[in-house]
Amino acid sequence: MAEKVYQVRNIYKCIHEKAGEKKTFTVRVPGSKSITNRALLLSMLSDGDCVLKGALFSDDSRYLVQCIADLGFAITADEAAEEIRVRGLSGRIPQKEASVYVGSAGTAARFLTALLGLKEGVWHLDASEQMRRRPMEPLLACLKTLGTQVIYEGEEGHFPFTLIAKAEETAEEAGRENRRTVTVDIAHSSQFLSALLIASCCSGRNLDIRVQGTHGMAYIDMTVKMMEQFGIVPQRLEGVSEKAGDAGAGGFRMGQGCYRHQVYEIEPDVSAACYFYAMAALLGIEGRVQGVHYDSLQGDVEFLRILERMGCETKETPEGIVLHGPEKGKLMGVEADMHACSDQAITLAAIAPYADSPVTITGIGHIRYQESDRLAAIAQELTRIGIRVQTREDGLTIYPGQPCPGKIHTYDDHRMAMGFSLTGLRAEGIEIDDPGCCRKTFAQYFEVLD
């Protein structure tokens, strides 16, 4: 977006002054970032031509598309048609040495690091200043255990670095029960585990991947289900539940195989959809997001259950879930463990001041290590507009209050920009600094909001 500040319009009073008018909206959101990026990796490792339909085109996905091209793969993107074509080479990477730049894309950063670290070659990886601040050591430690040399070009455990990966085992060796074991700590990011899962079956190594922590298991579920859709079924070891968030000290047993090429439909982005469902809740109106259903691969659909506890009603329809906000947006306070849908912690925090009692969010300590220190950012910005907040190690409590005018700092974090835009729909004088940071996942967000 060209403007440096977005002025949010208080539309609450306007909506409820029009007595008798049906208050409803339907919106369409772009494809899921998480699914698009996983599908890109699975496609490049597949046994032939893949077509991804409904793909997201954002900063993150464009970085990953460029990285795949830089590795020598045939890949074409048609943004108008929302379609990406990738020619997989049955797990082979065309080049033996390459430099890739992942920008601020966390999935590209973690997934490509795991893949390249398990494939013979010399790989130079770099990232944006924002991504350079985010941790990589838990994943790099696993690669080092498997014999990959890591040469840091800056701070240890962070981008940039060079991976020197040794040749994978021969087919004969891979067939033996000389299984290797690595343990990955997912306290800061479940992407470390997802990355190893996707890459391991094409690595020439039989791996047992042990897991420390339970953060982000909804995203692990997504990864496993998508691997299954592409023809590889990870074997769960004792301690890993089928239910998101129930994983213990278990893991996954991975053998060798090849992903199947296919035409793959990308789901709408439920993370993006949640802003519009929260808007319907906040304004006390009816909202539908096309193509969003409760059987989604995406864990953020659980956010709608939290909105139900705050007084909303939801209904499945063939076109998508419809949410009815409570009369005049009279939300109830709630205590919510959001470990399975932590990307929506900012969304809930942004509408929490309008609840009739405190809103307590738990299970989100890991969001301190994302695009920004999101826990600190939430507290800082709510305090800036006059809302009382109490923080703790794994969450925070937000107390009811009417927000004052103020400019919301976004910290180059797309979710801060989109989430806090909701606060201004029932308050005067709320501005969003740097709305253009939404390019990371949803460049047209403020146009759709308008």
Identify the meaning behind each predicted range.
Residues M1-D450:
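Structural preference for solvent-exposed beta-strand-turn elements
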